[in-house]
A protein has these predicted regions:
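Catalytic strand-loop segment that frames the active site of acyl-thioester-processing enzymes
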Residues: 61-134, 148
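HotDog/MaoC-like acyl-thioester-processing domains
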Residues: 4-96, 161, 166-169
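A general, composition-driven signal for non-globular sequence regions
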Residues: 21, 36-37, 129-131, 139
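Active-site helix/loop of acyl-thioester processing domains in fatty-acid/polyketide metabolism
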Residues: 1, 5-10, 48-49, 107, ...
């Protein structure tokens, strides 16, 4: 289950070049028996031509029901992927309502995330949702688009980093 994602954009990502990503596991945290484990990864996205890093993607994945394996406390210290703070007080600075297609989760699924939670109504209901839900990364992409249009005057190069935590609606 995708828990957190942070993207740091080092350069403008070219649309006409071949890219590659190298992923490393940064940490695995045992949350305890029946609570699962967090798997923290770092992916460096680079140009295949010259190897120049273009972006760094940090992810936190929850392996549900895979906890209780650590024999020492060294696997129980959680790194900080996303700095938390108190929610802001008052009205939001900007509200952007973006309508998505009813089949958006099925289209995004073509990226390779075949979790049935995003496609199968029966599985979604068993998980406590009324219907299949949109992927977290797809929602993140929609939020990024909104930030670029509303806060960056349509200039994607002005967005240097975004971090999100995926939680229940």
């Amino acid at each position: 289950l995708h828990a957190e994602e942070s993207i740091e954009l080092l350069e403008t990502i070219p649309i006409n070049k071949t890219l590659f990503g190298k992923t490393t596991i940064e940490s695995i945290v045992d949350r305890g028996a029946g609570k699962g484990s967090f798997i923290y990864t770092k992916k460096v996205l680079s140009s295949k031509e010259d190897g120049k890093p273009l972006a760094i993607v940090y992810s936190n994945t929850l392996a549900r029901a895979d906890g209780g394996w650590a024999k020492t406390d060294s696997f129980k210290k959680k790194p900080t992927l996303i700095q938390t703070s108190n929610p802001p007080v008052g009205e939001p600075d900007i509200i952007d309502n973006i309508e998505t297609l009813p089949q958006a989760a099925l289209l995004y699924r073509l990226c390779g995330d075949m979790n049935p939670l995003h496609a199968d109504p029966v599985i979604a209901k068993k998980a406590g949702f009324n219907s299949p839900i949109l992927h977290g990364r797809c929602t993140m992409g929609i939020a990024m688009r909104s930030l670029i249009t509303k806060c960056c005057d349509f200039d994607a190069t002005r967005l240097a980093q975004i971090s999100v935590r995926f939680s229940s609606p």
